[in-house]
C-alpha cells in the first residue's frame, strides 16, 4: 500500500507540475511570437545583439552560478540528484527571449528542457522525493516542457524518458512522462496557442527504395547533429582561448553574428526560422538554407547565448 501511495504521490506531483509547465510554455511561446513581430517591425534590431550578449554573459557570471551549465545540470539532476538553482528557469526564459528579440539564431527546446527540469527538480526537493521518485518527476518535467513547447506530446514523452540515458528508456517514468506531456500540451492549447501543423499530402510506398533513402537520410541527419554539437563546442573553445575577458568574448561573438546578418542578408535566419519547415515540405528549400542556419546558430550559441540543446560530449542529442 505504501508503494502505491508513493507512486500516486509521484504521479500527482508530476501532473501538477505539468499544468504549470503548460502555462509557462504558453507565456514563452507568446513572447517568442512578440519577439518575431518586433524584428519584423525593426529589421535592424540585430545591431543590438552584442549588447544583449554582454548583458547575458554578465548576469550569468554574477548571479547565474550553476545555471550556466544549462541542460547538463538538468541531466545531472535527473541522474544523480544534483541540485538545480531556482533562478535557472527565470534566467533562461528571460535571456532566451532577449536573444530572440535582437536577432540571435536560437531555438526553444533547450530553454523548455531547462525550465521544465528546473521546476520539477526544485518541487521534488521541496517535497522530499529521493532517488528514482525524484528522477521520475524531473523526467516528466522534461517531457511536459518538450511536448507543450512543440505541440508534440508523443515525441515529448519519449524525449523525456530517453534524453538522460541515451539509448535506454526509463520504464518507471513511462506513465508519468506520457500523462504529463499530453496534459501540458493540452493546457498550452487550451490557453489559445496554435502550434504549426505540417501536413503530409501523400505517404510513399514502403519499398526497398524508400527504406534505402530513409536510412541514408537518418545517417546524414545524425552526422549533422553531431557536427552541430561539435561546432558549438569548438566555437566556444576558440572564443575562450582568443579572449581572456568573458564580456569581450560575448561582445565579439555576437558582433560577428550581427555582421553576417548584415553582410549576407540573413534576416530570415534569425530566431526560430520556422518558415524553413514549410519550404521543405513544399519542396522549395534552397541549397544554402541549411548551411546558413547552421552557421548562424552555431555562432550565436558559441558566443554564449542561452537556449541550446548541446549536452555532454558523450551524450549529445545527435546520439539519440
Residue ranges of model-derived segments:
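Alpha-helical transmembrane segments and immediately membrane-proximal extracytoplasmic
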Residues: 1-318
Amino acid at each position: 500500500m505504501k508503494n502505491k501511495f508513493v507512486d500516486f504521490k509521484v504521479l500527482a506531483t508530476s501532473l501538477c507540475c505539468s499544468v504549470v509547465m503548460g502555462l509557462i510554455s504558453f507565456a514563452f511561446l507568446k513572447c517568442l511570437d512578440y519577439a518575431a513581430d518586433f524584428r519584423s517591425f525593426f529589421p535592424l534590431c540585430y545591431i543590438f545583439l552584442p549588447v544583449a550578449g554582454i548583458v547575458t554573459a554578465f548576469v550569468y557570471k554574477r548571479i547565474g552560478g550553476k545555471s550556466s551549465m544549462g541542460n547538463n545540470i538538468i541531466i545531472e539532476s535527473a541522474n544523480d540528484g544534483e541540485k538545480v538553482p531556482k533562478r535557472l528557469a527565470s534566467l533562461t526564459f528571460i535571456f532566451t527571449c532577449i536573444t530572440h528579440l535582437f536577432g540571435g539564431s536560437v531555438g526553444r527546446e533547450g530553454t523548455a528542457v531547462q525550465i521544465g527540469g528546473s521546476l520539477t527538480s526544485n518541487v521534488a526537493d521541496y517535497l522530499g522525493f529521493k532517488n528514482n521518485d525524484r528522477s521520475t518527476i524531473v523526467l516528466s518535467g522534461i517531457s511536459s516542457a518538450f511536448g507543450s513547447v512543440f505541440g508534440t506530446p508523443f515525441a515529448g514523452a519519449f524525449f523525456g524518458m530517453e534524453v538522460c540515458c541515451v539509448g535506454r528508456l526509463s520504464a518507471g517514468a513511462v506513465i508519468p512522462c506520457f500523462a504529463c506531456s499530453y496534459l501540458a500540451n493540452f493546457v498550452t492549447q487550451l490557453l489559445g496557442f496554435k502550434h504549426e501543423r505540417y501536413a503530409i499530402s501523400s505517404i510513399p510506398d514502403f519499398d526497398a527504395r524508400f527504406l534505402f533513402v530513409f536510412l541514408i537520410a537518418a545517417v546524414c541527419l545524425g552526422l549533422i547533429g553531431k557536427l552541430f554539437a561539435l561546432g558549438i563546442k569548438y566555437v566556444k573553445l576558440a572564443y575562450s582561448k582568443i579572449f581572456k575577458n568573458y564580456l569581450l568574448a560575448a561582445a565579439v561573438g555576437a558582433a560577428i553574428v550581427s555582421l553576417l546578418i548584415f553582410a549576407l542578408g540573413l534576416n530570415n535566419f534569425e530566431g526560430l526560422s520556422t518558415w524553413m519547415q514549410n519550404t521543405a515540405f513544399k519542396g522549395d528549400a534552397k541549397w544554402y538554407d541549411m548551411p546558413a542556419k547552421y552557421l548562424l546558430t552555431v555562432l550565436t550559441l558559441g558566443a554564449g547565448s542561452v537556449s541550446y540543446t548541446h549536452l555532454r560530449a558523450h551524450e549529445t542529442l545527435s546520439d539519440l
